[in-house]
């Protein structure tokens, strides 16, 4: 069993687990990078610590400073944990329809929440946060969508961990959100082997898949670099729900909703390889644990009811 000097030191080092039952064939294997094993239960612990370390090193954050961040979920929770440990005050701008779990977790770690109008979603939260940052220049505005430390977190840790554990990797699949995971881990993996395909799972245009975004709908994160990607794969809300339930029922992995979208893309890529007579090792990200989504009913209702039950509330 590994020993760490502090909670922050335990971030990362997550297992890569094979999915023998969901893999399309014995020669086309799926591998789950279990980011739910991080301290707050999501991959965003890597991002939060990387952004804090960079801000401290640059002098952007002084002891006792106030941190500002737009978020509808995991990044805020990760920052709240890290800010509490390091003695910072955190203000999160969140859409007013963000799920109760998110608000309760943030408040538990001492974060202050400023609500933005629900109609604008996370894009409106970003706009409000930028206004507040301009009005309060003494605050540390980390801004995950444009912070190079977000990408660096995955270039320096997530990507190397995957390649060390799976040197035969042929495909890497992750969700399109801030794009930090895809840009960082994807760039690292393609440097190690240019033949590795990097696939972004994104919501089908006009559909809502929680925690992900379709960049054709108006907001393109500053971190996004299309040259890192091999392709973008569109996923519907129902696909996400169905696959996250498959992951639980078939492989026993209890993951969050966006992971269902990523798994759906990974399985489709695997099926393509089978049809083409190719072997493949496909690594994908399990973004967070399903315990943050219990009140959605996703894991108990039928698929149609579960999909409808997500409408109107941000769960990631």
Question: What would you call each of these model-derived segments?
Answer:
Residues 1-316:
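PLP-dependent amino-acid enzyme catalytic core
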